[in-house]
C-alpha cells in the first residue's frame, strides 16, 4: 500500500502567491513565496499550506513571505521543480489552522468585550 502524506486539502484557492526567490542547495530547493497581509495570521512556521495543490510544511515566515523546503522526492513527483522566480502559484491555507485562529480570535474578542 502507498502512504498518503500531508494534510487534507479541499482545492479552495485562497490567493495567488508569487515566487520571490528560489534558493537551490545540492538537490533541494527553498521557495520563498509572497503573500497578502490579510493572510499573515494563518501562515505559521511548521504549519501546513497547499502550493499548486501540493501539501507542504511552512518553513520560516516573515511579514511578506514564507519559505517551503522542497526535498528531492517532492521535486521528482510534482511539477514544483519547474517553477521560476516570478512564477505565480495557487495557495490554499490549511482549513484547520484557519478554524483554530478564528476561534481563538473570537474567544479573545468576547473576553475583551465581556
Task: List each model region and its residues.
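Conserved loop->alpha-helix
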Residues: 1-114
